Amino acid sequence: MENRSDFEADDYGDISWSNWSNWSTPAGVLFSAMSSVLSASNHTPLPDFGQELALSTSSFNHSQTLSTDLPAVGDVEDAAEDAAASMETGSFAFVVPWWRQVLWSILFGGMVIVATGGNLIVVWIVMTTKRMRTVTNYFIVNLSIADAMVSSLNVTFNYYYMLDSDWPFGEFYCKLSQFIAMLSICASVFTLMAISIDRYVAIIRPLQPRMSKRCNLAIAAVIWLASTLISCPMMIIYRTEEVPVRGLSNRTVCYPEWPDGPTNHSTMESLYNILIIILTYFLPIVSMTVTYSRVGIELWGSKTIGECTPRQVENVRSKRRVVKMMIVVVLIFAICWLPFHSYFIITSCYPAITEAPFIQELYLAIYWLAMSNSMYNPIIYCWMNSRFRYGFKMVFRWCLFVRVGTEPFSRRENLTSRYSCSGSPDHNRIKRNDTQKSILYTCPSSPKSHRISHSGTGRSATLRNSLPAESLSSGGSGGGGHRKRLSYQQEMQQRWSGPNSATAVTNSSSTANTTQLLS
């Protein structure tokens, strides 16, 4: 191997910083940025090897994997030898100053813990509580799974890769890590679009049948299937290569190798990345802006003719709360990823920007902001939804500063009253059957509606009012006894304290409700 202190431009093209700033390979800038900052902190010039070894992935890959920008397919060995030879002209210690290691460890470690733990708690709350198993919440579970995947299976390993500049996890996981990154972001974005469409249909066209659980699962399957197909190239183009470094042990790099040429010089890569940025950012943002704008006009801009029942009013308020929460989720997504995409579009048009002295630290901040999007959704759910908030309190009730309290009752069950007795002060409606007769008492002085039913085979009283959901529900038509219907609060307490505790809460609350009704 011929020792050369510098790469020849004729053989290897432009290996300057701007070459790594191409928007089609944004993550390629990250390790170069850290290398430049590292070199500047040691007051030593950055050798060519520091520019040759760089993170290079697709523009929406959610990852930062160290890789080599190879000159051409089949020249891997020559590029590695030339990179190693260039190390003879300077020293490049793959060591980040300790204070920067602490800083980035806090930022990335905190992000991984909050994103993974928070999203898994959201999944647990929905899947273990019957009252939370709604169409929108199932989509939220899908979104949480995708966010938990990228934070635990991709960010964690890439953070180690950033610090040590070595990929010790093997070639298979090099491929799998990039595949998971692309799969997760596609699934997240498509799920957000599905939620916006579901809210649009439910609010704009309320007479259409609501989405069934089977349809919900089918849509989730289509989302993951489409995301898998889009992410498949990651399993094909990524590979690992061992690169010798003078004075240090060999380093293994994980990099993309496109069939028609190296990264930054591949037409296939450019077309693929353009498709990805359209499908996973611009198209979803436009789609969700249109749907939520139409929904917002319907919920906040339209007026109802005539008087509304309290339940109708509360239904509108409930829909507004859900839409507000999802709009915040979409806004956070757009804000987190806008600087990321803007950076690479701008630097592709104006490469000179990449020579600015502050560009390295700026990119690190932009990258962390984009990756941190996965940790904000659980915080938003806990902040804007009382049931998710109660579920989080139950999980962290062992903390001294957490007070569980009582869960707000279901508003849909709280308001079962109807102001329908404007004609006469009192009226009774009696319905007789062979096995059952029911009497409905409606009183204008109270919004409460009491219904007492007696079965023919056995006697069981059911009192339904506008108070909590802890009221009793009658047993089957032929059973005789009665069974208690657990509220959301009781379901959560039963998960943590056992059935005896939930039964005690049910009995006490039911007795209180019955006393209040009869009084």
From Swiss-Prot:
Q: What Gene3D superfamilies does the annotation carry?
A: Rhodopsin 7-helix transmembrane proteins (1.20.1070.10)
Q: In which tissues is it expressed?
A: During late embryogenesis (stages 11-15), expressed in the brain and in a specific subset of neurons in each neuromere of the developing ventral ganglion. Expressed in the cortex of the adult brain, which contains the neuronal cell bodies.
* Gene Ontology MF annotations: neuropeptide receptor activity; tachykinin receptor activity
Instruction: Provide the membrane-side ranges marked Extracellular in the record.
Output: 1-100, 156-175, 239-270, 347-361
Q: Which residues are glycosylated?
A: 3, 19, 22, 61
Which CDD domains does this chain map to?
A: 7tmA_TACR
Q: Where does this one sit in the cell?
A: Cell membrane
Q: List the disulfide bonds.
A: 174-254
Lipid attachment locations (S-palmitoyl cysteine): 399
Record SMART domains: 7TM_GPCR_Srsx (SM01381)
Q: What is one term from the GO cellular component aspect held by the record?
A: membrane
Matching entries from SUPFAM superfamilies are given as: Family A G protein-coupled receptor-like
Its transmembrane ranges are 101-123, 135-155, 176-197, 218-238, 271-292, 325-346, 362-384
**InterPro entries under this entry?**
GPCR_Rhodpsn, GPCR_Rhodpsn_7TM, Neurokn_rcpt
- Output compositional bias ranges, type Low complexity: 500-519
What keywords is this UniProt entry annotated with? Cell membrane, Disulfide bond, G-protein coupled receptor, Glycoprotein, Lipoprotein, Membrane, Palmitate, Receptor, Transducer, Transmembrane, Transmembrane helix
Known Pfam families for this protein?
7tm_1
| Feature: compositional bias, Polar residues | 454-465, 487-499
**Family, per the entry?**
Belongs to the G-protein coupled receptor 1 family.
Its protein name is Tachykinin-like peptides receptor 99D
Species this chain originates from: Drosophila melanogaster
